[in-house]
Amino acid sequence: MRKKITIPEILLMKQEGRKVTVLTAYDYPTARLVDAGGVDAILVGDSAGVVFSGHENTLPVTMDEMLYHVKAVVRARPKALVVADMPFMACQSGEIEALKNCGRMLQEGGAEAVKIEGGSNMAPIIRAVTEMDIPVMGHVGLTPQSVHRMGGYKVQGRKDQAERILEDAHAVQEAGAFAVVLEGIPAKLAARITEMLEIPTIGIGAGPACDGQVLVIHDILGLCEKYSPKFVKRYADLAPLITEAARQYVSEVKDGTFPTEEHSFS
């Protein structure tokens, strides 16, 4: 039986050159399954707003919705570290509101860390939260909560943007984050940041040099057919299997071949 993954263990993994593996989960059964697969951390992402609730982006996701998902994941008692995404505007309104909301994720939700999007602009908030012993994972580069400012989900850090993202990553580390997600940036830039920082970098669309990788579970299982980013590798194709199972069920109920005596009580 593997041991519980903690934040010191995540930090040690970078020091020892061991890759950190992260997948998202939003419910109890999925959390159990990905944990059994051996992931080091489960991110309860605000991506739930898109892949679970059907929104166009993550902006509509609320604190109450995130707490619902976090509680469901925590009930699986995973060995993986549980990190809760802070939804849009949960931390942007100031330190007091950020502390209250991040505290709820740990106290009510049972998460072991939170993830806050933003770089230098959010460093004071990250510092205030970490000083209250709430562990923070940062997130720089392509930050989905900034989708309108970026004009869509576009690669960040090309040309003159590179130095800004380097500064953002450094600011997040200096503010006390234990790790930082690098999303949607050139692989060479991610490699520079990874070499520069003492904390682990977790890449998503940021190349192979990062200290770890994170992907959305629905993407690797082929459950989001309408949108598949370049950086996603599909490890299973469950969508047609689910559709076919539903089709067989409908057919058997309609023609009377289900349920049979085997599925009935005497």
UniProtKB/Swiss-Prot annotation:
Pathway linked to the protein: Cofactor biosynthesis; (R)-pantothenate biosynthesis; (R)-pantoate from 3-methyl-2-oxobutanoate: step 1/2
Residues noted as binding Mg(2+) in the record, renumbered to the chain: D46, D85, E117
A GO cellular-component term linked to this record: cytoplasm
Cofactor info, note text: Binds 1 Mg(2+) ion per subunit.
Catalysed reaction equations from the record: 3-methyl-2-oxobutanoate + (6R)-5,10-methylene-5,6,7,8-tetrahydrofolate + H2O = 2-dehydropantoate + (6S)-5,6,7,8-tetrahydrofolate
Binding site for 3-methyl-2-oxobutanoate: D46, S47, D85, K115
Keywords on record: Cytoplasm, Magnesium, Metal-binding, Pantothenate biosynthesis, Transferase
Active site residues according to the UniProt entry: E183 (proton acceptor)
InterPro entries in the cross-refs: Pantoate_hydroxy_MeTrfase (IPR003700), Pyrv/PenolPyrv_kinase-like_dom (IPR015813), Pyrv_kinase-like_dom_sf (IPR040442)
Signal peptide: none
Localization of this protein: Cytoplasm
One function term, GO molecular function aspect: 3-methyl-2-oxobutanoate hydroxymethyltransferase activity
Keyword Zinc part of the UniProt annotation: no
UniProt keyword Ubl conjugation present: no
GO biological-process terms attached to the record: pantothenate biosynthetic process
Entry's EC annotation: 2.1.2.11
Cofactor(s) needed for function: Mg(2+)
Primary localisation category: cytoplasm
UniProt subunit comment: Homodecamer; pentamer of dimers.
Protein purpose: Catalyzes the reversible reaction in which hydroxymethyl group from 5,10-methylenetetrahydrofolate is transferred onto alpha-ketoisovalerate to form ketopantoate.
Similarity field: Belongs to the PanB family.
Record protein name field: 3-methyl-2-oxobutanoate hydroxymethyltransferase
Organism: Trichlorobacter lovleyi (strain ATCC BAA-1151 / DSM 17278 / SZ) (Geobacter lovleyi)
UniProt gene name: panB
